[in-house]
Amino acid sequence: MHRLLAWDAACLPPPPAAFRPMEVANFYYEPDCLAYGAKAARAAPRAPAAEPAIGEHERAIDFSPYLEPLAPAADFAAPAPAHHDFLSDLFADDYGAKPSKKPADYGYVSLGRAGAKAAPPACFPPPPPAALKAEPGFEPADCKRADDAPAMAAGFPFALRAYLGYQATPSGSSGSLSTSSSSSPPGTPSPADAKAAPAACFAGPPAAPAKAKAKKTVDKLSDEYKMRRERNNIAVRKSRDKAKMRNLETQHKVLELTAENERLQKKVEQLSRELSTLRNLFKQLPEPLLASAGHC
């Protein structure tokens, strides 16, 4: 961690035109912000500037070459290269003439690292370009014809590599994906599935049925054939006799039920006649007799 002491103006970017530096409680990093270790030699003290508006740790800088890079300048013999900027010039001005030891290779970014030859001599070199991740290609899992099988077999090693990149288990069966996220692409089918896919999608012509068993030639004049026919005839006659018996029993049952129904109907008619006779008798009796009979 840096120490909050004083910030060197050489490490600051050029301020805008309407910007005035803020000095609150004098919290600046000390001038050794470009030091390579914790015990680096501090920069030599500078003479105070003539103008009273500039602070102790600041100095007057001519911004005209940087604000107008295309304008001709009398102080510069040739225009500065494109890769040089304001901070790089300040860095070269402050530390270019002083001999320094080889900086220690720490984890944080070293502002004056001697090994970074490709980066411009600025306080903060640009970060290296990020490596591009190449995603494996995926082929559509559509069913192909049987004549495309040689082409599929030719491209099988690449499909297998892409498949192994997304399959969690290196088995022949289709395993689970490496991540459960729904944004990850589906895995390539396994070799067994790829071989079985054409057969599942295109069944092709139906397989020829197995050759029927050759019919055994039977000699109708043989005793075995005659015995079989006789047994079949006996079984047919028995079944017919049973059917006739069931029909006769059903007819007999129907006749019995019909006779019972007629008998009951006759009984109902007789009772109806008796009821009507009794009603007529009660109508012919006198009322006083009926009243006395009711009290009894």
Swiss-Prot record:
<keyword id="KW-0010">Activator</keyword>
<dbReference type="GO" id="GO:0006357">
    <property type="term" value="P:regulation of transcription by RNA polymerase II"/>
</dbReference>
<feature type="region of interest" description="Leucine-zipper">
    <location>
        <begin position="248"/>
        <end position="255"/>
    </location>
</feature>
<dbReference type="GO" id="GO:0042130">
    <property type="term" value="P:negative regulation of T cell proliferation"/>
</dbReference>
<dbReference type="GO" id="GO:0001227">
    <property type="term" value="F:DNA-binding transcription repressor activity, RNA polymerase II-specific"/>
</dbReference>
<dbReference type="GO" id="GO:0033598">
    <property type="term" value="P:mammary gland epithelial cell proliferation"/>
</dbReference>
<dbReference type="GO" id="GO:0071230">
    <property type="term" value="P:cellular response to amino acid stimulus"/>
</dbReference>
<dbReference type="GO" id="GO:0050729">
    <property type="term" value="P:positive regulation of inflammatory response"/>
</dbReference>
<dbReference type="GO" id="GO:0006355">
    <property type="term" value="P:regulation of DNA-templated transcription"/>
</dbReference>
<dbReference type="GO" id="GO:0042742">
    <property type="term" value="P:defense response to bacterium"/>
</dbReference>
<keyword id="KW-0488">Methylation</keyword>
<feature type="region of interest" description="Required for MYC transcriptional repression">
    <location>
        <begin position="22"/>
        <end position="104"/>
    </location>
</feature>
<feature type="modified residue" description="Phosphothreonine; by GSK3-beta">
    <location>
        <position position="179"/>
    </location>
</feature>
<dbReference type="GO" id="GO:0000978">
    <property type="term" value="F:RNA polymerase II cis-regulatory region sequence-specific DNA binding"/>
</dbReference>
<feature type="cross-link" description="Glycyl lysine isopeptide (Lys-Gly) (interchain with G-Cter in SUMO2)">
    <location>
        <position position="211"/>
    </location>
</feature>
<feature type="modified residue" description="N6-acetyllysine; by KAT2A and KAT2B">
    <location>
        <position position="101"/>
    </location>
</feature>
<dbReference type="GO" id="GO:0000979">
    <property type="term" value="F:RNA polymerase II core promoter sequence-specific DNA binding"/>
</dbReference>
<dbReference type="GO" id="GO:0007613">
    <property type="term" value="P:memory"/>
</dbReference>
<dbReference type="GO" id="GO:0042802">
    <property type="term" value="F:identical protein binding"/>
</dbReference>
<keyword id="KW-0221">Differentiation</keyword>
<feature type="modified residue" description="N6-acetyllysine; by KAT2A and KAT2B; alternate">
    <location>
        <position position="102"/>
    </location>
</feature>
<dbReference type="GO" id="GO:0031490">
    <property type="term" value="F:chromatin DNA binding"/>
</dbReference>
<dbReference type="GO" id="GO:0097421">
    <property type="term" value="P:liver regeneration"/>
</dbReference>
<feature type="modified residue" description="Phosphothreonine; by RPS6KA1 and PKC/PRKCA">
    <location>
        <position position="217"/>
    </location>
</feature>
<dbReference type="GO" id="GO:0090575">
    <property type="term" value="C:RNA polymerase II transcription regulator complex"/>
</dbReference>
<dbReference type="GO" id="GO:0000981">
    <property type="term" value="F:DNA-binding transcription factor activity, RNA polymerase II-specific"/>
</dbReference>
<dbReference type="GO" id="GO:0045944">
    <property type="term" value="P:positive regulation of transcription by RNA polymerase II"/>
</dbReference>
<dbReference type="GO" id="GO:0042803">
    <property type="term" value="F:protein homodimerization activity"/>
</dbReference>
<dbReference type="GO" id="GO:0045892">
    <property type="term" value="P:negative regulation of DNA-templated transcription"/>
</dbReference>
<feature type="modified residue" description="Phosphoserine; by PKC/PRKCA">
    <location>
        <position position="239"/>
    </location>
</feature>
<dbReference type="GO" id="GO:0000977">
    <property type="term" value="F:RNA polymerase II transcription regulatory region sequence-specific DNA binding"/>
</dbReference>
<dbReference type="GO" id="GO:0005737">
    <property type="term" value="C:cytoplasm"/>
</dbReference>
<feature type="modified residue" description="Asymmetric dimethylarginine; by CARM1">
    <location>
        <position position="3"/>
    </location>
</feature>
<dbReference type="GO" id="GO:1990647">
    <property type="term" value="C:C/EBP complex"/>
</dbReference>
<dbReference type="GO" id="GO:0003677">
    <property type="term" value="F:DNA binding"/>
</dbReference>
<feature type="cross-link" description="Glycyl lysine isopeptide (Lys-Gly) (interchain with G-Cter in SUMO2)">
    <location>
        <position position="213"/>
    </location>
</feature>
<dbReference type="InterPro" id="IPR046347">
    <property type="entry name" value="bZIP_sf"/>
</dbReference>
<dbReference type="GO" id="GO:0003682">
    <property type="term" value="F:chromatin binding"/>
</dbReference>
<keyword id="KW-0804">Transcription</keyword>
<feature type="region of interest" description="Disordered">
    <location>
        <begin position="171"/>
        <end position="199"/>
    </location>
</feature>
<dbReference type="GO" id="GO:0032753">
    <property type="term" value="P:positive regulation of interleukin-4 production"/>
</dbReference>
<dbReference type="GO" id="GO:0000779">
    <property type="term" value="C:condensed chromosome, centromeric region"/>
</dbReference>
